[in-house]
């Protein structure tokens, strides 16, 4: 067996969404900060293509690269690679990374609770892991500051007419639309249609509304979050959502950055206040338990500090290799399973 490279991976999913973790075989990319390192990964694309494209990956897969932290407060850094983006932050991926770090012994587990500080490209995140019998059973992550950008903005979408949307940042950038406006329900049988419509809405929002982070070089809207109405029971709000990820797939989890974004919009509209909780439910029925911890300011904008809580499970280990005679060193994409991102 011969190979010009061997990449060691621990497989993982958080509430249904794949978030595999590279634990060896890749040197840290160049960059003075984790953000700069993530920009190198995004622009170079060599590693992204190798691990995400067929025959080694697929549109369903997200992969995280562990890197030494740049911030002295952090114990580990990580860079997130999604099908079309290399984002600042991801809730499900941070839960996967935390679980792999503890379950594999890379960071020592303390029962019943382990506290960690990790460094995502978008900033420092604080992690609290509930642990028992050698397993990280639930991960709570303090996400980066989240804020609403545009509220109730009109958006013209081909085939849908004019719809009203919100744009918001929850660790990544979203356009949010109510499912009823587009004549859809969030259920597994409509996954393909939801994904395709969501990508179309994202494209229209980038063309007509745009987005710019006040502190990061992040100048586009990444995702469309499709929501159903929120219900309230005391100080707990519950809402079903699904996020369309380019090129056209649905997040299987409730989307941690999406839940953070939704809480930011609810707060901006006066429908949620500090200390209240939000349960986000996915298209699979899995849940993230979240809290609007406090209100703050980011770059002159009102913002919130959200906490996301969910579970993840290790699914296996693997080694990705490249035989020198392989005709597809960068992999390939076919539109039968990798929809065209138009």
Swiss-Prot record:
Q: Which GO terms describe its molecular function?
A: 4-hydroxyproline epimerase activity; trans-L-3-hydroxyproline dehydratase activity
Q: Which InterPro entries match?
A: Pro_racemase_fam
Reading the lineage from the top rank, the first entry is: Bacteria
* Pfam families on file: Pro_racemase (PF05544)
Task: List, alphabetically, the Gene3D superfamilies matched.
Answer: Diaminopimelate Epimerase, Chain A, domain 1
User: Belongs to which family?
Assistant: Belongs to the proline racemase family.
Instruction: Identify the NCBIfam families for this entry.
Output: T3LHypDht
Provide the protein name: Uncharacterized protein BCAN_A0346
Tell me what organism the protein belongs to: Brucella canis (strain ATCC 23365 / NCTC 10854 / RM-666)
The upper taxonomy is: Bacteria, Pseudomonadati, Pseudomonadota, Alphaproteobacteria, Hyphomicrobiales
């Amino acid at each position: 067996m011969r190979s010009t490279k061997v990449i060691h991976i621990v497989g993982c999913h958080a509430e249904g969404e794949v978030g595999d973790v590279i634990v060896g075989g890749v040197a840290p990319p160049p960059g003075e900060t984790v953000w700069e390192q993530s920009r190198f990964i995004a622009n170079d694309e060599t590693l992204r293509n190798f691990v995400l494209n067929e025959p080694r990956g697929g549109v369903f897969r997200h992969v995280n690269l562990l890197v030494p932290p740049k911030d002295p407060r952090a114990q580990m850094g990580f860079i997130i690679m999604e099908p079309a983006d290399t984002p600042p932050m991801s809730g499900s991926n941070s839960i996967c990374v935390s679980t792999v770090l503890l379950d594999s012994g890379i960071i020592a587990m303390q029962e019943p609770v382990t506290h960690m500080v990790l460094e995502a490209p978008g900033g420092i995140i604080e992690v609290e892991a509930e642990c028992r019998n050698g397993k990280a059973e639930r991960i709570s992550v303090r996400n980066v500051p989240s804020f609403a950008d545009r509220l109730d903005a009109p958006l013209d979408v081909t085939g849908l007419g004019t719809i009203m949307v919100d744009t918001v940042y929850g660790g990544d950038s979203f356009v949010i639309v109510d499912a009823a406006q587009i004549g859809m329900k969030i259920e597994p049988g409509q996954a393909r249609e939801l994904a395709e419509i969501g990508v179309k809405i994202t494209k229209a929002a980038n063309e007509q509304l745009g987005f710019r982070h006040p502190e990061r070089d992040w100048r586009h809207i990444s995702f469309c979050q499709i929501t159903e109405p929120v219900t309230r029971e005391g100080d707990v709000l519950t809402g079903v959502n699904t996020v369309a990820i380019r090129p056209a797939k649905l997040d299987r989890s409730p989307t941690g950055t999406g839940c953070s974004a939704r809480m930011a919009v609810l707060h901006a509209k006066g429908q949620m206040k500090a200390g209240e909780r939000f349960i986000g439910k996915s298209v699979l029925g899995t849940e993230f338990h979240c809290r609007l911890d406090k209100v703050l300011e980011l770059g002159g904008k009102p913002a919130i500090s959200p906490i996301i809580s969910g579970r993840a499970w290790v699914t296996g280990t693997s080694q990705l290799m490249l035989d020198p005679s392989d005709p597809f060193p960068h992999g390939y994409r076919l539109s039968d399973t990798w929809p065209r991102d138009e």
